[in-house]
Amino acid sequence: MASGSPLELLLNNQNISAAEVERQRIKLGLDQPLYIQYFTWIKNFFQGNLGDSYRTGQPVMQMILEGLGPTILLTFAAVIIACLISIPLGVQSARYQNKGWDNGSSVFSFLATSTPSFFLALIFLYVFSVKLKVLPIGGMYDVGKKETIGSLLCHLFMPSVVLAMQLVGSLIQYTRSSMLEVMREDFVRTARSKGIKEKKVIIKHVLRNSLIPVVTYLGMEIPLLIGGAVVTEQVFSWPGIGLIIYQSIFTS
């Protein structure tokens, strides 16, 4: 059970009388036993009624739907960026196994995996927003200006790259392992024995068959990526579900 009560928000207002507090307590159903409150919540949940936010007074379902779009957009952009970075590096790592490309990719994947997202986000903000002043510090659009695609892309760049880094390290290694496994298959050796250029063998035969498990892995990682968006959305003030969750926790 979480500590605190919505009534504490009312009690902070010294002008609220004890009678009004008690009336609100009955209205919210907080006078009922905990098990009654729980089963009431379950019943309302399956009816699509999540109640109203104690913080804003808005229906919770409305807040979720408003935040869902930005979170999906951020996650989609992060997945695209992660694929554009990871798949080429994974391919090169497998192609030049135990050489410079492979060692460099291994170091990069280690750094991407081990660096906390909030730390990377602060570095991005300091470099691109404070020092270089080329990217906005937060939000989804420029405040007080027309909402344009250009403004959206500028605001989307940093949080999507930071979120993508959570996926890049493991995706590089997964692509590399999948490539190496396919490269040992007989049909690859047959293609090489026919004199087909190595680049064509890698792209047409190896990569095409390696992407099947990679796509499956991506499908499993996307829900975790959405969960990891909480910190990223909070740092960049991105108006998604993660920011709503963060604000709700600390308000309560």
Report residues per predicted region.
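Hydrophobic alpha-helical transmembrane segments of membrane transport/permease proteins
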Residues: 1-39, 132-152
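Transmembrane helix irregularities
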Residues: 2, 112-115, 226
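Flexible, glycine-biased helix-capping/connector loops in cytosolic signal-transduction modules
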Residues: 5, 46-48, 185, 228
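Residue-level recognition of pore/gate-forming positions within transmembrane alpha-helices
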Residues: 15, 83, 110, 126-127, ...
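Hydrophobic alpha-helical segments of integral membrane proteins
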Residues: 24, 34-50, 60, 64, ...
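An internal, D/E-rich "acidic patch" concept
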Residues: 31-87
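Alpha-helical transmembrane segments of integral membrane proteins
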Residues: 65-101, 117, 146-252
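Membrane-water interface segments at transmembrane-helix boundaries in multipass membrane proteins
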Residues: 106-115, 119-170
